[in-house]
Regions:
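Conserved functional hotspots at enzyme active or ligand-binding sites that engage polyanionic ligands
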Residues: 1-112
Length: 112
């Protein structure tokens, strides 16, 4: 897996407002870590709840951009570290412009 790729993930049963079950995620971890022996990967959760597109830093993706069946939103405030084995199938890699917007959103939410 590479930074900027959208994957289907099999997340555990959700607790509270945490993400769970089968859902798309965006790999945001740097590639040297993705290519290492580290067994985990940092992802941003993707949702079809378009109301979340209004939240600061979140990025709306069209179906063609994401490869998903519905327009979706990368929720930059919902970052999760998961075991790499939970990534089940690669959907596609985002192009430069939506990834640039995601990176801006990550800088905003992480204050870096």
């Amino acid at each position: 897996m590479k930074r900027g790729e959208v994957w289907w993930a099999a997340l555990p049963v959700p607790i509270g407002s945490g993400p769970g079950l089968r859902r798309p995620v965006l790999v945001i971890q740097a590639n040297p870590f993705n290519d290492s022996r580290i067994a985990t990967v940092i992802v941003a959760v993707i949702t079809s709840n378009l109301a979340l597109a209004a939240a600061p830093g979140n990025v709306r993706l069209g179906k063609a951009e994401s490869g998903l069946p519905k327009p979706s939103v990368v929720n930059v405030s919902q970052l999760v570290t998961i075991d790499k084995s939970l990534l089940k199938s690669r959907i596609r890699a985002l192009t430069a412009e939506p990834m640039r917007l995601v990176e801006e959103g990550l800088r905003l939410v992480l204050a870096v």
